[in-house]
Amino acid sequence: AEAMKCCHAGSSLELNAIMVNLLCKLDRPELAEKQSKMMQQIDDDSTIAQLACAWAHCASGGKKIQDASYIYQELGDKYKWTPKLYNGSAVCSMMMGSYDDAERDLLEAIALDPKDADTLANLAACASHLGKSSGRFINAMKQTGVAHDALTKISALEDDFERAAAHVDA
């Protein structure tokens, strides 16, 4: 709530982008879209406004995912592809069910930064959908030392499994 107050008080594109990100995390895609449109009215060509638009489109889902994918493609082609842009493109591909395309983007991202925790987490998810082992990506993520959300969830699931197994054995 405090972060939203701070973002709402400012009028910079950066603060607006943080607000879009917060709204996406709060599962309020309609408000994220509205905030993104406000940013585009300020400066439609700015990279940060385009990224915020892609985030809002991903959160909205449906046909807007393709629009988000186009934004990531345009930014990667216009500037330089980064692991974050590859990850954004891969997430769009996964949301559209194109796991082979997602894997291709993620392998490009991991070639640029082999220790990027987001890329490793997305590779693990993508591998699972492709019927491949995700263990090496999870292990690599653990070795980065980054406290990633995916690792927290995996740890909680492992704990739940251990508790359930203990009840079965008892």
Go through each PLM region and give its residues.
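Long, repeat-rich segments with strong aromatic
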Residues: 70, 78-102
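Residue-level recognition of tetratricopeptide repeat
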Residues: 21, 55-57, 91, 125
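Structural motif corresponding to the intra-repeat A-B loop/turn of tetratricopeptide repeats
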Residues: 26, 60-62, 96, 130-131
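TPR/TPR-like alpha-solenoid signature
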Residues: 17, 51-53, 87-88, 94, ...
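Terminal, low-structured helical/coil segments at or just beyond the last alpha-helical repeat
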Residues: 133-170
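Start-of-helix register in tetratricopeptide repeats
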Residues: 14, 31, 48-51, 84, ...
